[in-house]
């Protein structure tokens, strides 16, 4: 899928730190946005006992999924590149078009890596470089 992973399995991380998987929340954000987007697992765990790891945006953010070739919106359930409209960016750019791929569902959306040919980006790259240098 193009999503980066670490060399350490999540089960080992959970064992060492003693944190339940239901309490590990992934944050998706970028410097260009004022807002962050989080997994819904804590909310779903404490409301109905489920494990919903789909992303949810705050009410002032709209994420639109677009066909990579035409930049027209795709239907829910279809993969597209993600554009974010963040009303908290009142003093800068309102919208950004990422090269991230994702699929929207009724319950949120999942990230599926980067578009073909897109440069790898993100904080995890620095972590990967440090880990590789110290391996």
Q: Where would I find each of the regions flagged by the language model?
A:
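Active-site glycine/GP-rich loop and adjacent strand/helix microenvironment
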Residues: 1-135
């Amino acid at each position: 899928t193009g999503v980066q992973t670490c060399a350490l399995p999540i089960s080992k991380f959970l064992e060492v730190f003693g944190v339940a998987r239901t309490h590990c929340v992934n944050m998706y954000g970028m410097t260009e946005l004022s807002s962050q987007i989080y997994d819904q697992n804590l909310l779903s765990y404490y409301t109905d006992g489920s494990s919903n790891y789909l992303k949810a945006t705050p009410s002032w953010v709209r994420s639109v999924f677009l066909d990579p070739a035409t930049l027209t919106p795709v239907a829910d359930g279809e993969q597209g590149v993600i554009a974010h409209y963040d009303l908290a960016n009142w003093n800068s750019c309102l919208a950004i078009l990422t090269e991230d791929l994702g699929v929207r569902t009724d319950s949120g959306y999942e990230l599926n890596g980067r578009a073909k040919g897109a440069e790898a980006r993100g904080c995890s790259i620095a972590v990967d470089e440090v880990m590789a240098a110290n391996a």
